[in-house]
């Protein structure tokens, strides 16, 4: 039996991170991008790097730069960074967690913050997944 607190090998951490990112986060990012486009915003989801970062970029049609929500791995610390950047005021908010932080509740909370604070919007799909009074 292995110690659950023992760190994973870097290779195993990166593999689990990539699998979790694609299985849990990517579909939620794609749905948020679709909702954003339906609300008249320009939105794009992309990955970059190794280990991959998943990024949702959103901008108003009049904006030349995008606000974003990015999930990235910190292999040295074996943690995940959830990063929100708001182009309107240049602020960044970062939430650190373990691999288990790549879940619908954390991602929905971050997406809700990005759209509420960055664009004054509520995403219908996020609102539908959570009961009234959740936020």
Which role does the model predict for each range below?
Residues 3, 9, 47, 72-74, ...:
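Serine/threonine-rich low-complexity intrinsically disordered regions
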Residues 23, 35, 71, 75, ...:
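A generic structural signal for solvent-exposed, polar alpha-helical segments
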Residues 59-113:
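Intrinsically disordered, low-complexity regulatory segments enriched in Ser/Thr/Pro
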Residues 19, 50, 61, 91, ...:
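Intrinsically disordered, low-complexity regions
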Residues 1-32, 117, 125, 129, ...:
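Charge-rich, low-complexity N-terminal segments
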Residues 31-79:
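Amphipathic, interaction-prone secondary-structure segments
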Residues 102-135:
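Amphipathic, soluble alpha/beta structural segments
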């Amino acid at each position: 039996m292995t110690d659950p607190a023992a760190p994973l090998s870097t290779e195993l951490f990166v593999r689990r991170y990539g699998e979790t990112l694609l299985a849990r986060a990517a579909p939620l990012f794609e749905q948020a991008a679709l909702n954003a486009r339906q609300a008249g915003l320009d939105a794009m989801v992309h990955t970059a790097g190794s280990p991959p970062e998943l990024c949702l970029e959103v901008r108003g049609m009049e904006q030349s730069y995008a606000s974003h929500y990015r999930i990235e791995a910190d292999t040295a610390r074996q943690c995940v960074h959830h990063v929100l950047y708001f182009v309107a005021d240049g602020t960044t908010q970062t939430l650190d967690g373990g691999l288990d932080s790549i879940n619908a509740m954390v991602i929905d909370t971050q997406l809700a913050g990005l759209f509420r604070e960055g664009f004054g919007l509520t995403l219908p799909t996020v609102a539908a997944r959570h009961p009234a009074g959740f936020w």
